[in-house]
């Protein structure tokens, strides 16, 4: 007989998923990273550090006609990187059409991801790479890209 309640196995699985999400995305390693961009300032003279704030009130917007952007993160020492979270400032529309993620290993750059759209939120599995440098390279966008958040966990 059905009770209209969620089965206890499903409840346990949902709690486990909630704990995984909470623990995995608790501490953003970007908070302790140096962050630079090419171009170095956005069209409103804002520093790239605004990308640490996870909201739509702060964003980094390229000059009109500049459809490429590189976001560089560097740490003092190597970190184990599991996930990268990217967000576009959706109030300005989804703009990114092609991007890649690269990291430094033994003095050379290696590509660990390439994709098309970012949109509201893109979560990328970095598979636990060990590095002190990560670059997000927006290679093409419909119009100047507007990024609102970068997180590394």
Model-derived regions, located:
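Trp- and acidic/polar-enriched beta-sheet ligand-binding modules for extracellular glycan
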Residues: 64-68, 79, 90-153
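Aromatic/acidic polysaccharide-binding cleft in carbohydrate-active enzymes
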Residues: 1-12
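Acidic-enriched, low-complexity/disordered segments with a strong bias for Aspartate over Glutamate
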Residues: 10, 31, 42, 54-55, ...
């Amino acid at each position: 007989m059905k009770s209209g309640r969620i089965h206890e196995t499903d409840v346990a699985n949902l709690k486990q998923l909630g704990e995984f999400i909470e623990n995995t995305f608790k501490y953003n390693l970007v908070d302790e990273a140096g962050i630079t961009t090419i171009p170095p300032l956005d069209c409103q003279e804002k520093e790239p550090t605004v990308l640490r704030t996870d909201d739509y009130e702060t964003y980094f917007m390229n000059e009109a006609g500049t459809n490429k952007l590189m976001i560089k993160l560097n740490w003092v020492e190597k970190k184990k990187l599991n996930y990268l979270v990217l967000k576009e400032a959706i109030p300005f529309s989804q703009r990114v059409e092609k991007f890649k993620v690269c990291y430094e290993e033994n003095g050379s750059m290696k590509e660990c991801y390439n994709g098309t759209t970012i949109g509201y939120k893109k979560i990328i599995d970095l598979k636990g790479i060990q590095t002190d440098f990560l670059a997000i390279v927006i290679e093409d966008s419909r119009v100047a890209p507007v990024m609102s958040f970068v997180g590394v966990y």
